[in-house]
Amino acid sequence: MKFPRRLVFKLTALFTMASLHPGLTVSGNPIKGYPDEIQEIRYPVEADNSEQPALFWKPYQYSEKAPLLVALHTWSSDYLQAGGEAKYAEWCVQNNWIFIHPNFRGRNRTPESMGSDLVVADIRAAVEWAKENAAVDESRIYAIGVSGGGHATQLLAGRTPEIWAGISSWCGISDIAAWHEQTSAAGLERYAKDIEMALGGAPLPRSQEEKDAIHRSPLTWLGKASPVPLDINHGINDGRDGSVPFTHSLHAWNAIVPESEKLPAEFIKEFYATQKPSADDVPNDPLYGERQPLFRRAHKNTRVTIFDGGHEIVHLAALNWLAAQKKGQPANWNPPKVADLQTSDKDTQSGK
């Protein structure tokens, strides 16, 4: 009896994983919305002696060391989130990159989630597990995320800068307490309620919840992120058509760069109120397609871009930029297009 080639390939991969790691849980079930090759695995986290789930793929028929993409789900989802998240997996399969999509404690509404120490431990452990189970090129380990994943990527840039060759952050929340206030005022109570459930209450001034929110906020840690090539992106309509005002990314920029490069508070306030950037001429960036940059600043390894869009990611720009980064080298702000990726508006706007 002959079996379909794709089935044979997947079964071979599963048997290989199981034989190398007998105690490892590997699911052979298809992952809805993902390429057939993607597997569900569980990996150990020493911080609380737990096993955490993730999606994983490695190029089994590719002997050379390969880049590792750590893709991070959005605020209200988990490691099984498809849509735009599955596009990261497609890129990896097409380009022989290693892919891991950790749960990092799931939806951001529990004390264990939302930028906790366990979140950081989970992602660090996911990287270590991938290195033990695949031929990872340690000079090309990347992180990517939008919305809640953007929050996590910024947090990682400050808390684990030694890991990354490049981090692509889109529409991230840089200040948990500020976002609680903003979502409450904007009638987006479900996000404010998520924050309160994670903290145990509202992050009111001088409260323990505020202290916890500060600990979970990228702004607290981004001062240590300058060695990491970090590309911060945000749509100019976010905060109106989306849930995260683009001011979060401008404040993230300010937290990293020296005083001479910081954006004045009055400029940030006026920019958000008017949606009119400075008169600076921003060159066309072909990787952004119809979502062209409207405002851009770069300083050494850090860049911030406000683009013509909303609460979304431009996969082609993000992934081609990451492909040009290598650990120990200065950020490459003029990346070539090394590969294409077909996406729809539904994919780019999946980050909620």
Region annotations inferred by a language model:
Residues 76-81, 165-166, 172-173, 177-223, ...:
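Mobile cap/lid helix-loop segments that gate and shape the active-site cleft of serine hydrolases
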Residues 26-63:
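N-terminal cap/lid segment of alpha/beta-hydrolase-fold proteins
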Residues 232-234:
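Short beta-strand/loop motif that positions the catalytic acidic residue
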Residues 296-351:
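Catalytic active-site module of serine/aspartate enzymes centered on a nucleophile-bearing elbow/loop
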Residues 131-133, 138-187:
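Primarily recognizes the serine-hydrolase "nucleophile elbow" in alpha/beta-hydrolase
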